[in-house]
C-alpha cells in the first residue's frame, strides 16, 4: 500500500469526477414525468439521504484506515465480508459495462463509427488509467475535471436558456419512486468510498468534502438530464451535445468523462477482489473487470438501468445501515481509529 496520503482537494476532485457522468444525466431523464418542481424536490431529497449515508460510510473506512470491504468484515465477519465483496465485484462489473455502453452510445451519436468501436476505445483507455495508477493521475484529473466543469456549464446554458415549451408532467413516475431513484446513485458508491478516504490525510474532512462535492455535482447532472427531457424534449445526450455545437470537443469529453468515472468502478472492483482472495492482485483484477465490462457493453443492450439501480440499493443500503449502527453505537468492534 502506498504511504502517500491524499489531500482534501484531491478527494474532492475524485468525487467531482464520479458525479460528472453520462449515467447520471440519463438517470435524470427518468424523472421528467414528474415535472420540474417535483423532480427537483425528489432529486434533492434523494441525494441528501444518499449522501448522508455516503458520508457515514466514508468516515468508517477513513478512521480505521481500511478499504470498504475490509470494514464490512468488522461487522459481518470473514464469511459475510466475502459475500458482500463478491456482490460488490459483480455490481462493479455491471457498472463498468453500463458506463462503457452509455459512453460509447453517446460517442457514436456524435461520430457514427460504430458503437462497438467506441466500447473498445473507452475500454482501452480505462485499462491505461489503471496501469498509470491512481496516485499518478493528479494533473491529468485536474485538467479533465476543469474541462468537464466547463462542459457542464455549456450544457446547462443550452438546455435552460434555449427555450422550449416543455413536456407536461404525467403519472408514469411516482414521487416515491423518483426519490428512490435519486438515492440509488449515491448508494451505488457506498461500497467504494472507503477505498479512497482510507488514504486521506484528514479522513473525516476529506469524506465530508467528497460527499458534498459528489452530492452537488450529481444533482447538477440529474437536473441537466431532467431539464433536457422536460424543456427540450431531448433524451439523447449525443443530440444535446450536437445542438450545443460541441462536436468533436463534446465527443472527447464524453469519452474522457466515461473513462475517469469508470476507472473508479474497475479500480475498486480490484480492491474488493482482494477481500475474496487475498493473493489476487487488485490492479490485475481491475483490468480483467474492464475487459469483461467492455465485452458486455458490446453484446448486451443496457438502455434502461433503473432495475439495476434499485437492486444495488436493496443490497447495500441495509449493509451500510448495520455498519453505521455498529460503528457509531457499538464502537467496541472498531478499536482502531479511536485511540
Q: Could you tell me what each predicted segment is?
A:
Residues 1-38, 50, 136, 174-179, ...:
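Membrane-interface "cap" regions at the ends of multi-pass membrane proteins
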Residues 4-6, 132-142, 168, 188-216, ...:
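Hydrophobic, small-residue-rich membrane helices and short re-entrant helix-turn-helix hairpins
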Residues 14-18, 84-89, 110-133, 145-156, ...:
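Transmembrane alpha-helical segments of multi-pass small-molecule transport proteins
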Residues 29-33, 59, 98, 102-110, ...:
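Membrane-water interface regions at transmembrane-helix termini and the short interhelical loops
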Residues 29-59, 73, 80-82, 214-216:
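Extracellular loop-to-transmembrane helix junctions
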Residues 30-41, 105-119, 135-144, 237-249, ...:
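Transmembrane helix-loop boundary segments of multi-pass membrane transporters
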Residues 80-112, 258-275:
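Hydrophobic transmembrane alpha-helices that form the core helical bundles
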Amino acid at each position: 500500500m502506498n504511504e502517500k496520503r491524499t489531500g482534501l482537494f484531491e478527494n474532492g476532485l475524485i468525487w467531482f469526477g464520479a458525479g460528472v457522468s453520462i449515467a447520471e444525466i440519463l438517470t435524470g431523464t427518468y424523472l421528467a414525468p414528474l415535472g420540474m418542481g417535483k423532480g427537483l424536490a425528489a432529486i434533492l431529497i434523494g441525494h441528501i439521504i444518499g449522501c448522508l449515508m455516503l458520508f457515514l460510510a466514508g468516515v468508517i473506512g477513513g478512521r480505521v484506515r481500511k478499504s470498504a470491504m475490509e470494514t464490512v468484515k468488522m461487522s459481518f465477519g470473514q464469511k459475510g465480508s466475502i459475500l458482500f465483496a463478491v456482490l460488490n465485484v459483480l455490481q462493479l462489473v455491471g457498472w463498468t459495462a453500463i458506463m462503457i455502453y452509455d459512453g460509447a452510445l453517446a460517442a457514436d451519436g456524435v461520430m457514427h463509427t460504430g458503437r462497438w468501436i467506441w466500447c473498445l476505445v473507452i475500454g482501452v483507455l480505462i485499462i491505461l488509467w489503471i496501469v498509470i495508477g491512481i496516485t499518478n493521475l493528479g494533473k491529468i484529473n485536474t485538467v479533465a475535471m476543469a474541462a468537464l466543469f466547463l462542459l457542464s456549464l455549456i450544457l446547462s446554458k443550452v438546455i435552460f436558456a434555449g427555450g422550449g415549451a416543455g413536456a407536461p408532467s404525467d403519472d408514469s413516475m411516482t414521487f416515491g419512486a423518483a426519490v428512490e431513484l435519486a438515492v440509488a446513485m449515491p448508494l451505488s458508491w457506498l461500497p467504494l468510498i472507503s477505498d479512497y478516504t482510507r488514504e486521506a490525510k484528514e479522513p473525516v474532512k476529506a469524506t465530508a468534502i467528497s460527499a458534498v462535492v459528489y452530492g452537488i455535482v450529481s444533482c447538477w447532472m440529474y437536473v441537466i438530464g431532467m431539464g433536457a427531457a422536460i424543456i427540450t424534449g431531448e433524451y439523447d445526450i449525443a443530440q444535446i451535445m450536437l445542438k450545443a455545437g460541441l462536436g468533436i470537443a463534446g465527443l472527447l469529453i464524453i469519452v474522457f468523462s466515461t473513462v475517469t468515472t469508470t476507472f473508479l468502478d474497475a479500480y475498486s472492483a480490484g480492491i474488493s477482489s482482494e477481500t475474496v482472495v487475498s493473493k489476487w492482485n487488485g490492479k490485475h483484477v481491475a483490468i480483467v473487470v474492464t475487459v469483461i465490462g467492455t465485452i458486455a457493453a458490446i453484446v448486451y443492450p443496457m438502455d434502461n438501468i433503473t432495475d439495476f439501480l434499485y437492486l444495488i440499493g436493496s443490497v447495500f443500503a441495509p449493509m451500510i445501515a448495520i455498519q453505521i449502527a455498529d460503528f457509531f453505537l457499538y464502537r467496541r468492534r472498531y478499536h482502531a481509529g479511536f485511540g
